């Protein structure tokens, strides 16, 4: 987490800036209908307000991760927009295809956060390749390399409890973003106002403008072929008549698993 949103005035007294930030959110015309009732519910609760607004989620090599909800210290569409604007500012300095791949898991609001990130990138003139359904992290890594993207975004909180969600960033090699790149993105995030600083267009607008496209079957087929090529004993399950029971414990898989057997 970053520095507290608190400063000392010229008399040395601590000014609780988090209260001002809370009031700004409370007065704002928030697009996510879930946030305003949540903010109203904590009015007058200084401990709760401080927990949500005295600090902000910090972007690092593992991206962001936090509890869903209203505030700078929570995962919501505004924190996602802010983070994506920081990433977009970095991508625009990298040349190349100016493209970012996006995937997401089945956690609460993962699809919303993924489309929100796509809208910020598109508003910055950056092309997006996003999966049309939830796919696991390796699929995001593969798409990042397949389309020769500058970066990849995976909306997931890995093994954390259901109340969490997260935002992971990957480099052009499909691996976790390096320390140096993450530090630059974090600096750009710090320059971006969480409520108003990010450029943004709707997902539908991005699709209409041709900036947002879904990951194609060519990429998916290449992914499955790459996995199948690494089988130690191809076709063993089918020839042996084995029946497999699969449970997705970490929220990140779906239909793709039916094909890889």
PLM regions and their residue ranges:
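Short, Lys/Arg-enriched N-terminal segments with co-localized hydrophobic residues
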Residues: 3-16
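Ferredoxin-reductase
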Residues: 23-28, 95-172
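Residues on a specific face of well-ordered alpha-helices
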Residues: 85, 115, 119, 138, ...
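Generic, well-ordered alpha-helical scaffold segments in large soluble proteins
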Residues: 86-90, 120, 124, 143, ...
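An N-terminal, well-structured beta->alpha segment
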Residues: 22-117, 212-244
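Single conserved hydrophobic/aromatic residue that forms the stacking wall/gate
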Residues: 251-261
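Short, glycine-/Ser/Thr-/acidic-enriched flexible segments
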Residues: 64-66, 71-73, 107, 135, ...
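Gly/Ser/Thr-enriched, mixed-charge loops and adjacent short helices
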Residues: 48-53, 57, 165-253
């Amino acid at each position: 987490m970053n520095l507290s949103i608190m400063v000392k005035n010229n008399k040395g007294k601590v000014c609780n800036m988090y209260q001002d930030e809370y009031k700004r959110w409370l007065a704002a015309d928030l697009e996510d209908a879930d946030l305003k009732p949540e903010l109203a519910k904590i009015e007058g609760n200084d401990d709760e307000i401080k927990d949500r607004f005295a600090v902000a989620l910090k972007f690092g090599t593992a991206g962001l991760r936090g509890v869903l909800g209203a505030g700078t210290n929570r995962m919501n569409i505004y924190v996602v927009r802010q983070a994506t604007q920081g990433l977009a500012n970095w991508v625009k300095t990298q040349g190349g295809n100016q493209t970012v791949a996006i995937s997401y898991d089945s956690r609460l609001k993962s699809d919303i956060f993924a489309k929100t990130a796509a809208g910020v990138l598109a508003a910055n003139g950056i092309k997006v390749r996003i999966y049309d359904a939830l796919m696991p992290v390796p699929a995001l890594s593969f798409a990042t390399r397949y389309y020769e993207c500058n970066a990849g975004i995976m909306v997931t909180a890995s093994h954390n409890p259901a109340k969490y969600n997260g935002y992971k960033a990957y480099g052009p090699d499909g691996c976790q973003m390096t320390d140096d790149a993450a530090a630059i993105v974090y600096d750009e995030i710090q320059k971006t106002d969480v409520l108003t600083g990010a450029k943004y267009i709707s997902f539908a607008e991005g699709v209409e403008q041709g900036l947002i496209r879904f990951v194609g079957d060519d990429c998916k087929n290449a992914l499955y072929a790459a996995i199948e090529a690494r089988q130690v004993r191809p076709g063993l399950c089918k020839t042996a008549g084995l029946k497999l029971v699969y449970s997705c414990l970490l929220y990140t898989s779906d239909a793709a698993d039916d094909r890889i057997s």
